[in-house]
Design a protein with these regions (language model features):
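Conserved N-terminal beta-strand and adjoining loop/helix that marks the start
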Residues: 1-18, 213
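A structural microfeature
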Residues: 20, 68-71, 217, 307
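Unchanged
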Residues: 41-65, 73-125
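Charged phosphate-binding loop/patch that engages nucleotide di/tri-phosphates or the phosphate backbone
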Residues: 125-139
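Conserved GNAT-fold acetyl-CoA-binding loop/helix
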Residues: 173-194, 205-207
Length: 336
């Protein structure tokens, strides 16, 4: 593998926004585009040392914590290939007053979920890789024990989570509940693409969950299609306020991650995202009546039993999925 040429700093604030700055129009490399903090390694520097130096030179801030190594990728400009490492970090300093490096940057901004297209301004080549990298950092969440990354397919910077999603659905317990035993890697890849499309279309979708370096499962939020029978049944049960956002919360953990409270961490992260990032009015979770373990998690994270609907799933005493299985529905609002 090539030696590391440059580093990038995905500086994130308490609102999960990422700091970007605009390169001056006079710059030879990528003039006029919005970029993250970063630059080339100097002789003898490690990537981490270069990161600390670049952050202070370009913003005046001090690196507090290198949270996570997000990406290791290569890009080409004017025939030269460069290897870049990008890190999610936090900093100390006045985040409202960065010290822009004279002659190099002329504006700054904090990018949240609704601001991602700023990364495409003046980007005449249509290259989405930096935009997608920032989106990944903005959408990632951390709990006490988990890192929750938005599920995507390969996107030119990140490898995506298809292989890990295949492992989740290969777990016998997960495969049973999701009727996934016969799914192929191509089936799972299509599902990952669907999750990625959900992030772009709905500003929310599923995460893949890691405990340290170990795969724990997947979970998060989905917007239930307004045209689906399930949406109509839920609306009839819980009321029209839920139908404004149509958010459903769920999780699926591999065997090594079950029974240790991790589903609750995913659930609470999903509720926080729904209410504090999206401004949602209500969130539901539903599972088959026979899945008492998931219902217990719903109760522990503060959701209230609302009643039952019928949908395709498992029912007590049945050996096959049926179209009218009873599902327990739980609901909560932002003040719950």
């Amino acid at each position: 593998m090539r030696v590391v040429d440059c580093v990038g700093a995905l500086i994130r604030d308490e609102q999960h926004r990422v700091y970007v700055q605009r390169r001056t129009a006079e710059r030879r490399l990528f003039p006029g585009i919005w970029d993250i903090v970063g630059g080339h390694l100097e002789p003898g520097e490690t990537p981490e040392q270069a990161l600390v130096r670049e952050v202070e030179e370009e913003t005046g801030w001090k690196v507090r914590d290198i949270v996570w190594s997000v990406a290791d990728w290569e890009w080409e400009y004017e025939g030269r290939v460069r290897r870049e490492l990008d890190y999610l970090i936090t900093v100390d300093g006045d985040l409202s007053r960065p010290r822009l490096e004279a002659g190099k940057h002329d504006a700054s901004a904090w990018v949240g979920p609704d601001d991602l297209e700023l990364l495409m301004v003046n980007r005449t080549d249509g290259d989405l890789r930096l935009r997608d990298l920032v989106a990944h950092a903005v959408r990632t969440r951390f709990t006490d024990r988990l890192r929750l990354e938005p599920i995507t397919g390969p996107n030119g910077v990140l490898p995506g989570q298809v292989a890990d999603l295949v492992s989740v659905y290969a777990d016998p317990w997960v495969a049973t509940w999701y009727d996934a035993a016969a799914w192929t890697p191509d089936d799972v890849a299509r599902q990952a693409a669907g999750y990625q499309a959900g992030w772009e279309r709905d500003s929310v979708s599923k995460w893949i969950a890691y405990e340290g370096g170990a795969l724990a499962g997947r979970g998060g939020l989905s917007r239930v299609s307004a045209e689906s029978p399930v949406a109509a049944a839920i609306t009839d049960l819980v009321g029209a306020e839920w139908a404004v956002d149509r958010l459903e919360l769920g999780w699926a953990l591999v065997e090594s991650a079950r029974g240790r409270g991790l589903a609750g961490e995913i659930g609470r992260a999903g509720l926080d995202f729904a209410f504090n990032t999206l401004g949602a009015r209500a969130v539901i979770a539903l599972t088959e009546r026979v899945n008492t373990a998931s219902q217990a998690v719903m109760q522990r994270i503060g959701m209230t039993y609302a009643g039952e609907i019928t949908a395709e799933g498992w029912a007590e005493g049945m050996k096959e999925i049926r179209p009218d299985a009873p599902f327990a529905v739980y609901i909560t609002g932002p003040q719950a």
